[in-house]
Amino acid sequence: YFNDKREMFVEFGFDISAIPKSVLAVPILSNIMQFAWLFDCLVWIESVDKQFYECLPRIKRSFQEMYRNYSFGGSLIAAKVIDNEHSVKKESALLFTGGVDATTTFLRIRDTHPILIDTFGWCNDRDDESCVFKADISAINRFAEEHCVQAEYIKSNFATFIKPEKVNKVLNRKLHNSWWFGFQHSLAFLGVASIVAFYYHIRTIYIGSSYTFGQAVNCVSDPRIDREFAVASCNVIHDAYELSRQQKIRVIVDAKKEADVQVNLRVCSFKEENCNQCEKCFRTMIEI
C-alpha cells in the first residue's frame, strides 16, 4: 500500500530543528491513522503531542458516524504523550489556494491578518519540481503582498506516499469512496499546517468548507472531523459551512464592490492558471 521507499517527507520554509519530535510526528500520523483505522492496524511511536493524541479518538468517532456499517479498528500506542501547550502569539492561519472557499474565509477573517499556508503534496521525491506549485507560489505571493499578510509554502509527498490506486480498490468496494476524498486530504493538509502553527504560536488554523448543510457527502473535510483536530495550543475552525457556494461568491463580489478588495480567483485544479474551459471554471464564471 506504500511507496517503494516507505518514506514520507515534508519541507518547510523555516528551520524546524527546535520543534519537539512529539509535534513533528503529527504530519505522518495525520496521514496514516486513517489507514490504521480502516485496516485495523496498531501504530507505535516514541512520542506524540498530547492534544493531538487526545483528538484522534474523536476524529475516529466522526468517521464511524459517517460509515455506520463499517467497523473502524486500530489504534495509536505512544511511549510518551507530551503536553506542548504554549503561549499564543498570532491569532490565525488559513489553508489557502486562491479558490472560492479559501478566498471567502480570508475575507471573513482578514482583520486577524492570517498567515496563508499553501501545500503541494504530490511530489514523488524531494527533487521533484512542479510548474503548478511555482504558479501557486507566484499568485499567492501577489495576493499576500496586496493584503499585507505573510505566506508559507510546504512541499511533501503525502499524496503519493500511500498508493491510492491500491487503497481505493478496497474502499470503492466496501465504502463506495476513495482514499484521498474520503479519508486523507484535509487531515493531511492540517497535519503539515500544524507545524507552521506551532512555529509561529498560532491559535487557530482555518480551513474553508467545501460543502454546506443538507449536502450528504462522505468527505474527510467535514466539520465533524476538521474541528476535532488539535495540536499543542492550536485548534481548527472549518469555516463557512453555513454558506452555499453561491453565497460565498456573493461575499467575494460584495468585497470587491464595497471595498475594492483585490481578488483574483484561481479555481482550476492542478493547472498553472484558470483554463476558462473546464466545468469548474465555467461554473464559477456563471456564479459570478
Question: What annotation goes with each model-predicted range?
Answer:
Residues 26-27, 31, 36-43, 47-94, ...:
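Nucleotide-activated chemistry modules centered on ATP-dependent adenylation/adenylyltransferase
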Residues 17-22, 133:
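Terminal, non-catalytic protein-protein interaction segments that mediate quaternary/complex assembly
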